[in-house]
């Protein structure tokens, strides 16, 4: 998928701090990464957006993908587009099928996690809805640092974009 931008390192390191419960250190690393990342202007299903990111603070300007049997973080600034097929069966509530368009105009078939990590273990009143990717709930792990549960939700300056309702995100390069 190419050489990652320098800001990916601090974003990955922040996950290690999340795992140990050191959310303040994770937040500082994420802030540094977000300051360095390029805003990703795009169109989402034909609507122009000045910026676009995953609503989950752990990810922000990256798209989690499975391509060729391997897990990748694809920086949105390194991508020309993401197209997703409409959900057709139960698998699509966990893995959204589609393809990414790379800067060299190569098209790569991908699976994108339709749910956030930990959703399968959800309990409580909305557990079934979360597991079925019908809703998204947010947990503020640290001031200003939000972790999602349930359906993946992309955010932009024009609103929210649930992954299962989104068909095409195009990024100009």
Stretch-by-stretch model annotation:
Residues 113-173:
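Helix-rich interaction surfaces within compact, conserved domain-sized segments
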Residues 29-31, 37:
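Inward-facing hydrophobic residues that define packing positions of alpha-helical scaffold repeats
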Residues 55-124:
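Hydrophobic protein-protein interaction segments
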Residues 1-6:
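TPR-adjacent "capping" and linker segments in tetratricopeptide-repeat scaffold/adaptor proteins
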């Amino acid at each position: 998928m190419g050489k990652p931008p320098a800001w990916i390192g601090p974003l990955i390191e922040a996950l290690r701090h999340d795992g140990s419960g050191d959310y303040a250190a994770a937040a500082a690393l994420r802030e540094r990464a977000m300051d360095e990342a390029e805003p990703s202007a795009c169109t989402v299903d034909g609507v122009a957006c000045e910026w676009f990111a995953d609503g989950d603070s752990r990810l922000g300007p990256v798209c989690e993908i499975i391509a060729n049997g391997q897990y990748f973080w694809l920086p949105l600034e390194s991508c020309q587009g993401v197209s997703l097929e409409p959900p057709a069966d139960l698998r699509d509530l966990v893995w959204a099928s589609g393809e990414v368009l790379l800067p060299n105009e190569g098209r790569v078939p991908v699976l994108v996690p339709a749910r956030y990590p930990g959703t399968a273990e959800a309990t409580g009143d909305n557990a079934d809805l979360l597991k079925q990717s019908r809703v998204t709930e947010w947990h503020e792990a640290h001031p200003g640092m939000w972790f999602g549960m349930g359906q993946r939700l992309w955010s932009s300056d024009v609103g929210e974009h649930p992954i299962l309702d989104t068909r095409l995100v195009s990024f100009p390069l």
